[in-house]
């Protein structure tokens, strides 16, 4: 998705302006540890806009890690399986923290548990302390996200990303779905 396609799909012009400015200033924004938080309904274009940010960062020579939250949590769990020959928890965590931009999609879809809350807080807090950028997407409003992942974690996300940008509208996937 490009900003022009998003504009034609009816994405909120204010959101497009903020995202466009972020893209134009990608280097300085990442150097400052700034990010974006995109919230809204299913299929509204959040992931596409976040991918545009990640793609622009990569094209500008920055390091980026892109995960859906379920995949990120599964990857963290896999670090506990020492006999699989993968990264240790510390190695993987250090990579998550060291990339210029961490892109986490579908924040809030995870089943809430103490372990999940601990992992999310650890990643977000460490990136907050190291002034590292994040772009996150969620279907939840801020209060619902606080209820799901904790007020401390959301507070740090607001510090990194600013308040959520609401990407609203109809599910853009339906008009593109093939007719049978």
Residues covered by each model-derived region:
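Pre-Walker A (pre-P-loop) alpha-helix and adjacent loop at the N terminus of AAA/AAA+ ATPase modules
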Residues: 5-36
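A short, basic N-terminal segment
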Residues: 1-17, 164-165, 175-180
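P-loop NTPase Walker A phosphate-binding motif
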Residues: 47-62
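Walker A/P-loop nucleotide-binding motif
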Residues: 32-50
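Short glycine-rich substrate-engagement loop in P-loop NTPases that contacts/grips substrate
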Residues: 11-16, 58, 62-98
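Loop/turn-to-beta-strand initiation segments
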Residues: 62-63, 98-101, 128-136
